[in-house]
Amino acid sequence: MGRLVFVSFGLLVVFLSLSGTGADCPSDWSSYEGHCYRVFQQEMTWEAAEKFCTQQHQKSHPVYFRSSEEVDFLVSILKFDLFWMGWRDIWNERRLQWSDGTKVNYKAWSAEPECVVCRATDNQWFSTSCSKTHNVICKF
């Protein structure tokens, strides 16, 4: 009887430790507020980071943020400063308009599309060339 109680208690402890958001994440992934994160200290272009994240998990993409608390959580597990965010082509041509309100239909950009990188130490976001290489955090 005592052994049954001990085993039952052990199973209860295991169940309670797995219940919650952590149980939904694959091993090697961290959980926060119902999302799963995996930090990769591996520099790559933004396009490669997007592809890499979807290879790690079908629903995964470079990280995006919903709150400053989410950023604080990620900073606590990071070992590097700069990483790609899941934001690309911030000067989205479909939304551009001239100051008089007319649509931009002629373009002569001198650079390629821009992507966004985050500096973890102070949560500052910067636009940069998508062809540069930075680390990536995948999220789903």
Curated annotation (Swiss-Prot):
The organism's taxonomic lineage, starting at the top: Eukaryota, Metazoa, Chordata, Craniata, Vertebrata
Organism: Crotalus adamanteus (Eastern diamondback rattlesnake)
SUPFAM superfamilies: C-type lectin-like
Protein name: C-type lectin 6
Domain C-type lectin: 32-139
Description of how the protein assembles with itself and partners: Heteromultimer; disulfide-linked.
Pfam families named in the record: Lectin_C (PF00059)
UniProt keyword annotations, A-Z: Disulfide bond, Hemostasis impairing toxin, Secreted, Signal, Toxin
Localisation: Secreted
Protein task: Interferes with one step of hemostasis (modulation of platelet aggregation, or coagulation cascade, for example).
